């Protein structure tokens, strides 16, 4: 027997797609009640207007949930501590998807809904990220993905549907790019960007100045970390949200944090994207420098070997997984002594190290110096080298010089 769905919680963005989903869901599920869930991730939009639009589109309720601080502390700071970059380039701004799914589920359970819905298309990664998280958090909820089932196939058809249902459609040219924005990044896809042979146009960037338009003087920033987490900027302790906003502004005006990449989507295709993440780029650089000072060689190398695994987990939306929990436990141990201060210069798209110190620094000048010292006995190296190279020596003897061609 088909399950009767009377109430649906919809992850709502305010765009054309999720706006027409409200009447569509009510039509296709016997006039079910639709509750819109809007997450404030620092996307710098008029969220009150978006809430009103949801209600005008037919939602019975619309929640606006401020998750900026939670996003920073529970998602972005673990990401910084991990040092993970997807395919060594992508700063993983879509880490917001599991958080959106989490809030959607929380409200769904509070409102006792039968199902949840999202606006991700059937060609992208987000459908996987949302649905993986929902199934992990509330497997009893039914998931509705209209883009995979409805007959609307184009923007023009969506506009016709919207007008037929009294949904306001702004009379403006279609944006040339598809964008996603939160406090961590802005992504740009589509339009001319779909062709990797074409240079990025000047009109793409919103948060970052083109290098040709950056100041001719460098700017110094100082970041303090405690157990791998950024806590202060230029000597001033700031909330996570304020720190990110301030650093985005400072680094953005110097043209820092722009990535033009072709990435492998989870669903099998390659896609080109432009990503702006000024604060993220600076934080990653500073954190990496501090780790080089505070972690042992074996710990640092093991952590680096796991970074792509962590990046894959985030990219694929497997935030709520046992594997991710286990990796977090390891990373947290590595960060116990990643405390200190890093000084950087920002100039013409470059992040230049300008000094760092930590009470837990493993760098000892008396050992590393090229001058005469009374600490390191260079004769000790001979025995180490003999043992370290013993297997190579034996192999060469057995194989009469070895064959390494």
Curated annotation (Swiss-Prot):
GO terms for cellular component: cytoplasm. ATP binds at residues 11-19, 119. It catalyses: L-citrulline + L-aspartate + ATP = 2-(N(omega)-L-arginino)succinate + AMP + diphosphate + H(+). It is found in: Cytoplasm. Pathway: Amino-acid biosynthesis; L-arginine biosynthesis; L-arginine from L-ornithine and carbamoyl phosphate: step 2/3. It comes from the Bacteria. L-citrulline binds at residues 90, 125, 129, 178, 187, 263, 275. It holds the Pfam family Arginosuc_syn_C. Keywords: Amino-acid biosynthesis, Arginine biosynthesis, ATP-binding, Cytoplasm, Ligase, Nucleotide-binding. L-aspartate binds at residues 121, 125-126. InterPro entries: Arginosuc_syn_C, Arginosuc_syn_N, Arginosuc_synth, Arginosuc_synth_CS, Arginosuc_synth_type_1_subfam, AS_cat/multimer_dom_body, Rossmann-like_a/b/a_fold. Belongs to the argininosuccinate synthase family. Type 1 subfamily. Homotetramer. This is Argininosuccinate synthase. It comes from Legionella pneumophila subsp. pneumophila (strain Philadelphia 1 / ATCC 33152 / DSM 7513). The lineage of its organism: Bacteria, Pseudomonadati, Pseudomonadota, Gammaproteobacteria, Legionellales.
């Amino acid at each position: 027997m088909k399950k009767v769905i009377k109430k649906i919680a919809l992850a709502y963005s305010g765009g054309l797609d999720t706006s027409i989903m409200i009447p569509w869901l009510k039509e296709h599920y016997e006039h079910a009640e639709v509750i819109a869930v809007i997450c404030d991730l620092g996307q710098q939009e008029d969220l009150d207007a978006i809430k009103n639009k949801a209600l005008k589109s037919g939602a019975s309720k619309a929640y606006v949930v401020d998750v900026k601080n939670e996003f920073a502390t529970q998602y972005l700071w673990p990401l910084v501590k991990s040092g993970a970059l997807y395919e060594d380039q992508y700063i993983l701004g879509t880490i917001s998807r599991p958080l959106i799914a989490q809030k959607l589920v929380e409200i769904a359970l509070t409102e006792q809904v039968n199902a949840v819905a999202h606006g991700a298309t059937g060609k992208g990664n987000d459908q996987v990220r949302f649905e993986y998280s929902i199934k992990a958090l509330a497997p009893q909820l039914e998931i509705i993905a209209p883009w995979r089932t409805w007959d609307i196939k184009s923007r023009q058809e969506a506009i016709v549907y919207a007008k037929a249902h009294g949904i306001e459609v702004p009379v403006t040219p279609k944006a040339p790019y598809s964008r996603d924005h939160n406090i961590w990044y802005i992504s740009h896809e589509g339009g001319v960007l779909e062709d990797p042979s074409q240079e990025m146009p000047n009109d793409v960037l919103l948060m970052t100045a083109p290098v040709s338009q950056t100041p001719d003087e460098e700017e110094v920033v100082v970041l303090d970390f405690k157990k791998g987490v950024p806590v202060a900027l230029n000597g001033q302790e700031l909330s996570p949200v304020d720190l990110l906003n301030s650093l985005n502004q400072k680094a953005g005006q110097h043209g820092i944090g722009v990535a033009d990449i072709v990435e492998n989507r989870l669903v099998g295709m390659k896609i080109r994207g432009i990503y702006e993440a000024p604060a993220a780029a600076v934080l990653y650089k500073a954190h990496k420098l501090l780790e080089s000072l505070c972690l042992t060689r074996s710990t640092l190398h093991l952590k680096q070997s796991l970074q792509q695994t962590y990046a894959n987990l985030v990219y694929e939306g497997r935030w709520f997984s046992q594997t991710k929990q286990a990796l977090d436990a390891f990373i947290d141990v590595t960060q116990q002594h990643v405390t200190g201060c890093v000084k950087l210069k920002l100039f013409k798209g470059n992040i230049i190290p300008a000094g760092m110190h930590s009470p837990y620094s493993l760098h000892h000048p008396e050992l590393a110096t090229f001058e005469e010292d009374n600490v390191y006995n260079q004769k000790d190296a001979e025995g180490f080298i003999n043992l370290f190279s013993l297997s190579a020596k034996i192999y060469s003897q057995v194989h009469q010089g070895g064959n390494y061609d």
